């Protein structure tokens, strides 16, 4: 039986490229090599496409994907050279230029099926401010927030923020994930510095009310018919679940399933599915919630390309539901092909 080609794109231009490499290495080991041939392409920080490795069987645990230290620029290709008829692309890319609709649009121009949400839902979900406004329109509860756009009057923003929110306050670049560029502010001075830090990553800044809450996550999978997982909980050994804690210091553990009341489970799964559909989601996403001590649920964000590392919540949530990592990849490939066929059928 001939194998189907699965194209892995990894690296990328955003500050989250290191997470992308870790995720892609986990995917390449989880693939069922009886069914798939894996071809990998590294995207440099400058946006160059580099042809790297090809795997017809499961690589050893010591095998690493080629990155900046090991690639040869002679391997550079035109981006369109990734095209292969019948192949499905897994863009294991996080953050801007990865899950913001950019690469999705490129793959649609190439007429290649790809895993994940489409151009519209990717771009909406990538921008935390736009996501909040969409979710507000359908009545999904979220923490209070204000917005700062580069070029606006910063002093006026500080006045508005301090009138509406109380410390602690969290400041986030609107278009970043993996906790990159996020700060916790306890004073007006810290708030100003946090906004300035966020502006180094994005011109749009989300300023949110801090809440004392558990962090609960729900996995989503599907196109027209969406399935959700039982929730999992991120248990932190640090005050603030930042990039360092997530991917470097390993100062988190996960409880899957989360120990929460059944009514809360039902509420979160419902909110997650409704939010996914409201954003036009397809393929997959992870929906992140805050759960306060008094039982209030707040939807924090939808992540359209969640981490796929060996310690990432998303594949572990599905494993808990009885869907093993290799089988999850196969389902994602099938969903990608379904969406491709649907898009093609709408072109007259």
Curated annotation (Swiss-Prot):
Cofactor dependency: Mg(2+); Mn(2+)
GO MF, one example: metal ion binding
Catalyses which reaction(s): 2 D-alanine + ATP = D-alanyl-D-alanine + ADP + phosphate + H(+)
Binding site for ATP: 162-217
Chief location category: cytoplasm
InterPro entries hit by this protein: ATP-grasp, ATP_grasp_subdomain_1, D-Ala_lig_Van_CS, D_ala_D_ala, Dala_Dala_lig_C, Dala_Dala_lig_N, PreATP-grasp_dom_sf
EC assignment: 6.3.2.4
Gene3D superfamilies: 3.40.50.20, ATP-grasp fold, A domain (3.30.1490.20), ATP-grasp fold, B domain (3.30.470.20)
Entry keyword Secreted: no
Keywords tagged on the record: ATP-binding, Cell shape, Cell wall biogenesis/degradation, Cytoplasm, Ligase, Magnesium, Manganese, Metal-binding, Nucleotide-binding, Peptidoglycan synthesis
Domain of life, per lineage: Bacteria
Recorded GO CC terms: cytosol
GO biological process, one term: regulation of cell shape
Cofactor annotation comment: Binds 2 magnesium or manganese ions per subunit.
Family matches, as Pfam families: Dala_Dala_lig_C, Dala_Dala_lig_N
Family as reported in the entry's similarity comment: Belongs to the D-alanine--D-alanine ligase family.
NCBIfam families (UniProt xref): D_ala_D_alaTIGR, PRK01966.1-4, PRK01966.1-5
PANTHER family: D-ALANINE--D-ALANINE LIGASE, D-ALANINE--D-ALANINE LIGASE A
Name by which UniProt lists this protein: D-alanine--D-alanine ligase
Species annotation: Streptococcus pyogenes serotype M2 (strain MGAS10270)
